[in-house]
Swiss-Prot record:
Keyword field contains Hydrolase: no
This protein's record includes keyword Hydrolase: no
Residues of the signal peptide: none
GO molecular-function term, one example from the UniProt record: calcium ion binding
Protein name as catalogued: Myosin regulatory light chain LC-2, mantle muscle
PANTHER family named in the record: MYOSIN REGULATORY LIGHT CHAIN 2
A single GO cellular-component term on record: myosin complex
Organism: Todarodes pacificus (Japanese flying squid)
Residues in coiled coil: none
Amino acid sequence: AEEAPRRVKLSQRQMQELKEAFTMIDQDRDGFIGMEDLKDMFSSLGRVPPDDELNAMLKECPGQLNFTAFLTLFGEKVSGTDPEDALRNAFSMFDEDGQGFIPEDYLKDLLENMGDNFSKEEIKNVWKDAPLKNKQFNYNKMVDIKGKAEDED
C-alpha cells in the first residue's frame, strides 16, 4: 500500500512565499514547472545544470509539478526551517565568494528582472533599509534587521 503524503502545517507567510517561489520558477506561466522552466530559472542564476540533474529534480514528483505538488515537495522542507535561515540561504545563492555580500548593482538587476520584477519605487523602498557598504549589500545584516522587525510585530 502506498503511504499517504504527510500533511504539513504551513503558516500563511510560508504559503505565500512558496506561491511566489513557484510563480518565479514557472517562467512560461502555464501552472506547471517543467524542464524548460528549470533551465530558464537556473540560467538566470548563472548556472545551467545538465539535463540528467534537472530530470532527477523533476522525478521527485510523480506526475506534473503543479503548485499542489510543489507545496507537497517543498512544504516539508520549509515547515521545519527558520525563516531567517531560509532568507540567508536564498541570498547566499547570489553570493559568489561566500563573504556575506552581494554587489549592489547585481542585486538591483535581479530585483528588476527576475520573478515578480520590482518597480523602481519598490527597489527604492527596499534600499532605504539596506545595509550597504562600498556598493556591497550585506545580506546577513539585512536578515538580522528583518528578524528583529518581525519579532516586534
